A protein has these predicted regions:
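Membrane-embedded alpha-helical bundles that constitute the cytochrome b-like, heme-associated redox core
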Residues: 1-177
């Protein structure tokens, strides 16, 4: 039923996918540009060690961002493209059969599943940091009225990734067949 619904709104989904791709590419280009600009402009000129006041998330953005980019490439290549191009092994194979394949790039493959879990945790951390940094930038963490948004970012950081990870673990433990 869900697949039928998504098929009926496919043009809207395509627009959303293009928008998401644009945002991701813009974010990557901006992050690389800002990283190099900041290193060039502030090479050893600060008297206070920035790592003393910055979070682990903030200090590891380049690592998590690289892993997330690799995740997107793998996910798009193996799962999204396989489904979109109808690269099924036979006519009776479904989208779920594709996910369950025990081949590199698919969720039935243990090393791929482990990588997906790690990547999902990095995505969660990356998003939590982004939301909290944006709230902090606009001064919305000081006012108790806005603290619920700050706390909500932690809640989202925990629940949504666990739902995705539970799917991967269910595939690996044979609950989803």
């Amino acid at each position: 039923q869900m697949v039928g619904l998504l098929e009926s709104i496919k043009p809207l989904i395509r627009v959303m996918e293009a928008g998401l791709l644009f945002i991701i590419v813009t974010h990557v280009v901006n992050a690389v540009y800002l990283t190099f600009s900041n290193k060039k402009a502030a090479a050893n000129r600060y008297s206070v060690d920035a790592s003393a006041t910055s979070s682990v998330n903030s200090r590891t953005m380049i690592i998590s961002g690289t892993i997330i980019l690799l995740f997107f490439i793998i996910h798009l290549r193996y799962i999204w493209f396989t489904y979109q191009a109808h690269l099924f092994l036979n006519e009776s194979e479904t989208y779920y059969d594709v996910l369950l394949r025990n081949q590199a790039g698919y969720l039935g493959h243990l090393p791929t599943a482990i990588f997906y879990i790690i990547a999902i945790l990095f995505i969660a951390s990356h998003l939590k940091h982004g939301v909290q940094s944006a709230l902090k930038t606009f001064g919305l963490t000081e006012n108790s009225k806005w603290k619920i948004l700050y706390s909500g970012s932690i809640l989202i950081w925990g629940i949504i990734p666990l739902a995705f990870i539970s799917i991967i673990l269910s595939i690996q433990f044979g609950i989803i067949k």
